[in-house]
Amino acid sequence: MDFDAIVIGGGHAGIEAALALSRLNFKTLMITQNLDTIGKLSCNPAIGGLAKGNMVREIDALGGEMGRIIDFSMIQFRVLNKSRGPAVQAPRAQADKLMYQTKAKETLERQDNLDLFQDTVVDFLLNSMRNEIEGVVTERGNKFRSSVVVLTTGTFLRGKIFIGEYRADMGRLAEFSAYGLDKTLLGLGFEMGRLKTGTPARIHKKSVDFSKTEVQFGDSDIIPFSFSNGKLDKSQLSCYVTYTNKKTHEIISENMHLSPLYSGEIVGNGPRYCPSIEDKIVKFKDKDRHQIFIEPEGFNTEEMYLNGLSSSLPENIQQKLINSIEGLEHAVITRPGYAVEYDYINPIELYPNLESKRVKGLFIAGQTNGSSGYEEAAAQGLMAGINAALRLQNKKPMILTRTSSYIGVLIDDLVTKGTKEPYRMFTSRAEHRLNLRHDTSDKRLIKIGYDLGLVDEKRYSRYLFKESRVEEIKELLKQRRLSLKDVVDEQLKKHVSKDFYHILKDPSISLDNLIKIDPSLSDSKVILEQVELDVKYEGYINRQKDLIKRLDNLELVKLPFDFNYEIIEGLSREAREKFSKIQPATLAQASRIPGIRSTDITVLLIYFSNPKNKVVINFSL
């Protein structure tokens, strides 16, 4: 059977890729090993967090689905870093795992132009003359033809799980690995490696003594992840906090030789910023305790997730170390923790549009690219789906810049630097994070989603109304002046005769203070928060915008794909090798490649400034 596009895998990357392609009116097929595990939250039952929550809102602004699914399935909501500045605040929600999964599958099943099929892809159909994808072959011998393929295998490509001495060819506990494509990819010359991740044990709620733990409530005011949702009124479940102790650490240290992480069994690098409890004990010997979050997995399950206690130690040792923790003395394990090792492709094998440099029409997204996390996977899946659709239309790729989004930072880091360990997004990876606040995701990206056709007219009109109202309130603030009779407290006295706009810049004055004086300024919480942040941080934002404008000038220098950098005189040997391998899309990307000198960038600029070299440069530094 023929399709326009095929998506391999039903995880978070696959979901976004399949929906983007089908919503852009391309006949799409998703092939996954088990239709009942589409959208499964394999590890922690949560979406969002620092930088990750921003990405979920960016996905939503572009027309993706993750924000709507978590809004539907959340069981607790919190804004992280509330006491700190807006640049590092982020929404995070606990999810009902089964509800999330069910909603994801239902969304796919009801989508026009999209078929789902349960099978395992083992090979590609290729036009070897043009080095171009033409479809896939499955384990059962089915052949499906298409012009583009999006590969999102997650942890399943030659996946292997470890629990003490137990080994099994699985991508998740009780779910078989995928074989076949690994040989195809190696045969095509892809640079591949092994990575490792892990998950903690789950325990039964009735076996926890919550009186010995600290309760963590959700926020009463829920900020929807999706801009299409208004106020959310949800029942929320609490999370709980406890800590490891000296006894816990002794148990782990005494049995470290039984951990496949330290016995040499696992060769793949694990996530630096989400280490196993074994790693924590080895690398942070000075710490006498580590925080553990006991998180519910849903409304209709008694299983609890032990966030911070990922382990691949033998099951009896996991039981001992868990029972050594306060509140968990009688905890009953329902599922053991384990490590999983899997194949990945070095992402420098990809262009910035996530298309493979080796095979035309093959796009790759998610953990297959060396990233870690549901949100990182979904972001790449959406961008791969969008760019696969643009390729089908013979249109230019859509590449988000580092200054426009966390998604842009994510993909640029991956395809420019590659990775040797699971890549996780942080606010610190973005040079201009004040410009990438989660509340401005629609302002930055919704026009792109609208122009693509992934954001409908109704939703875009609602955004335009919101923005016009924000600007209207700012104008009212500039026009309204504080009179002596308005002063109700000492803080305002020094601002008499000033306009409200400049008064609001005072850190000690909130917009609520001014609304009490003039109720006509009142509006929805979302609009008022954006107004206040825009005004208070206007100076910082404008300075960042000036810097971004200068940096974006380098993005305007587009470099040709498949270019022979050996012909450019004056480049260092290292620059020639790295430019030839990575094939940067812009001068800005070239400048971010590790090891590249400023002189190499100058040489490129001079070379491509020559009109005969067919690169149009339109900027002024």
From Swiss-Prot:
Keywords: Cytoplasm, FAD, Flavoprotein, NAD, tRNA processing. InterPro entries: FAD/NAD-bd_sf, GIDA_C_N, MnmG, MnmG-rel, MnmG-rel_CS, MnmG_C, MnmG_C_subdom, MnmG_C_subdom_sf. Its cofactor is FAD. PROSITE patterns: GIDA_1, GIDA_2. NAD(+) binds at residues 270-284. FAD binds at G9, G10, G11, H12, A13, G14. The keyword tRNA processing applies. It holds the Pfam family SAM_GIDA_C. It is found in: Cytoplasm. GO terms for molecular function: flavin adenine dinucleotide binding. The keyword Flavoprotein applies. GO terms for cellular component: cytosol. NAD-binding protein involved in the addition of a carboxymethylaminomethyl (cmnm) group at the wobble position (U34) of certain tRNAs, forming tRNA-cmnm(5)s(2)U34. Homodimer. Heterotetramer of two MnmE and two MnmG subunits. This is tRNA uridine 5-carboxymethylaminomethyl modification enzyme MnmG. It comes from Borreliella burgdorferi (strain ATCC 35210 / DSM 4680 / CIP 102532 / B31) (Borrelia burgdorferi).
